[in-house]
Amino acid sequence: MTNITEKEIPSPLKDNYKIDNYNWKLESCSKDDNNSRIVYCGINKEDKNDCIYVKQIKISFVSYKKILKEIYFLILLKKMDFFVHLDDILLSLDKGCIFLIFIGNTVSLNSLINSKKNNYLSNKELVKWIIYQITFGLYILHSNNIIHNDIKPPNILIDGDSNVTICDFGSASYKQESSEDYTRYYSPPEFLNDTRIIRDEKSDIWALGVIMIELFLVQNNFFKNRNENNKNKNNKNQLEYILSKFGIKQNISNEEINKLINNDSNLKYNIIFEKEEIEKINDKDAVELINNLLVINPKKRISAFDALKSNYLKEYSEGELSSDLNIIEKPINYEELTDEISKENFEIIFNKLKAKIKD
């Protein structure tokens, strides 16, 4: 998402900041590359301690099924800790938009990492607390066979009390479902090697490991090759760069890559950190957890449950864990969202979901 200026703000928000019953003052907004999704942030005029976030989705750019799935997962999780709470959804067919409305007062982890003047992340106990909450959120998702598919710093929100909420379920799916969207720098080797595969919970686990490194180093996109020409950026280049961080040669053959990903031997590759990176992390238990999250063979990557029991996180998770957290009641029959959806059915299902928000 990139920030946009006041002049670039599209209607219907440019001239009228009142949407339905929400009265707010627009402060900022950002958009994705093709303008299909725009996120607005503003101050709630009726309660200035709260911000209002409006995610505008253009229906012409995103399939009915994808829009409804995002709303479905947001409603499914709205009463759970560690997840963004959806306040309302609005449909404007004449403007061709859906509005998802959230109320809170948060900043993204991405913003905290990018803030050069902010010493917030210099507190290593606070970093551990953030990592614990993200991990517990993934534990809840995976216990319910939900894969987020786009865990990254912009999708992790933190409030003034350092409470974490995971947001943006536009790529979420149930296990064994395909999901087309991904962010290359947080995608695991097996997916970069073959994007046709169906991602599972181990994809989220890889992203968690990347985020851990970035929190300790206060650096975004740890797996981004800063020396690479933009024209050369593709999944193969990205995969080779990731493998180089494990000390594995570049220009490796596809056959050798497949052997690494499906390696069943006891041989394990770990990230080779620079001396200054080790000094910044300065926690052997954290390094051990990172090495167990960032395993090239997905079958050998630990689960969120096991990560919570690790030496690094166990002080927060002791007494909190259950091997089963399947406690979520589904707002509608999910099978309604698995087939192609007509415009008429879209409106019917949308209204069904909207009725469930205030339950």
Walk through the language-model features, giving the residues of each.
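Conserved short submotifs of the Hanks-type protein kinase catalytic core
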Residues: K95-S108
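C-terminal intrinsically disordered, low-complexity extensions immediately downstream
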Residues: G319-D359
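Glycine-rich ATP phosphate-binding loop
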Residues: I38-N44, K48-K58
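Catalytic-loop of the protein kinase fold
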Residues: H142-I158
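Activation segment signature within eukaryotic-like protein kinase domains
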Residues: I130-I131
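Conserved catalytic-loop aspartate of Hanks-type protein kinases
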Residues: D204
